[in-house]
Each structure stands twice: as C-alpha cells, then as structure tokens.
Amino acid sequence: MSWQAYVDDHLMCDIEGHEGHRLTAAAIVGQDGSVWAQSATFPQFKPEEMNGIMTDFNEPGHLAPTGLHLGGTKYMVIQGEAGAVIRGKKGSGGITIKKTGQALVFGIYEEPVTPGQCNMVVERLGDYLLEQGL
C-alpha cells in the first residue's frame, strides 16, 4: 500500500459511525521533515516548525510555553503522551501528532469532528505503523 493510500484511506476517511465527518487535513511525515504523503489540504510547514515538534517529542514540554506551530497556525499544546503523542487546540479545532519509529502521523480537525475522534484516527494508524516496524 502506498503512503498516499494510508493518508486517503485511513486518515481522511469518514469517522466510524459519523458519515461525512472526517479530518480537515492529514499527513505522514518522516522524522527528517520529508513529506511521505499528505492530503491536498495539509498546510505547507516550515523546517523550524518540524524541528520544534521533533524537539518536543525528545524533550516533552518544549512547545508548551510557545505553542505548536504548523503552517503558520499556532495551537495551544494540551495533554498528550510524553515522547509519543502531541495534541494541540485552536478554537473549535485542533491537531494530533503520533510519533512512530520513523515518521510522524498528523491529523488536523475542525468541528463537528471531536478531539477524541481525531486522536482515535491518528493514533490507530500510528500504532499500526509501529507494529509494522515503521
């Protein structure tokens, strides 16, 4: 399966039990900042934004004072899982980032999608990739 198929079929799909509800944007990005696959709506990010995200995975709490920035959008960092998941909130939407062995799985959402639904979609794929050694 191509990386693009993972994004299209497992991240940008309808949320279980909520037909028509899906993430706003999603991507799989290598830990070096190279985009493996992304939705058409995923924001163009700056290298320093990706560096900040990787630093937060290695030094949990790094982004808390400044916020998480992606594509020029600032998210308030909320409870995640140190070294494994970063979650951010902005208004009625937010972001979930799951770290795997080699990549980062991104999901961005707006209402009516809930934070929990975004977490479920992103973390399920991230856990699967981890199980596959990726």
From Swiss-Prot:
Q: How is it modified after translation?
A: Phosphorylated by MAP kinases.
Q: Could you say which protein family the record assigns here?
A: Belongs to the profilin family.
Where in the sequence is Phosphothreonine found? 114
What the entry lists under PANTHER family is as follows: PROFILIN, PROFILIN-5
- List the GO terms this entry assigns under cellular component, sorted alphabetically: cell cortex; cytoskeleton
What more the UniProt record tells us is: The variability of the residues taking part of IgE-binding epitopes might be responsible of the difference in cross-reactivity among olive pollen cultivars, and between distantly related pollen species, leading to a variable range of allergy reactions among atopic patients.
Q: Assembly and interactions?
A: Occurs in many kinds of cells as a complex with monomeric actin in a 1:1 ratio.
Query: Which CDD domains does the record associate with it?
Result: PROF
Q: What is the documented function of this protein?
A: Binds to actin and affects the structure of the cytoskeleton. At high concentrations, profilin prevents the polymerization of actin, whereas it enhances it at low concentrations.
What is the annotated localization of this protein? Cytoplasm, Cytoskeleton
Q: Which Pfam families match?
A: Profilin (PF00235)
Instruction: Report the residue ranges where the short sequence motif Involved in PIP2 interaction is annotated in this entry.
Output: 84-100
Provide the primary localization. cytoplasm
> GO terms for molecular function, please?
actin monomer binding
> What is this protein identified as?
Profilin-3
Q: Which domain of life is it from?
A: Eukaryota
All disulfide bonds of the chain are: 13-118
Q: Which UniProt keywords apply?
A: Actin-binding, Allergen, Cytoplasm, Cytoskeleton, Disulfide bond, Phosphoprotein
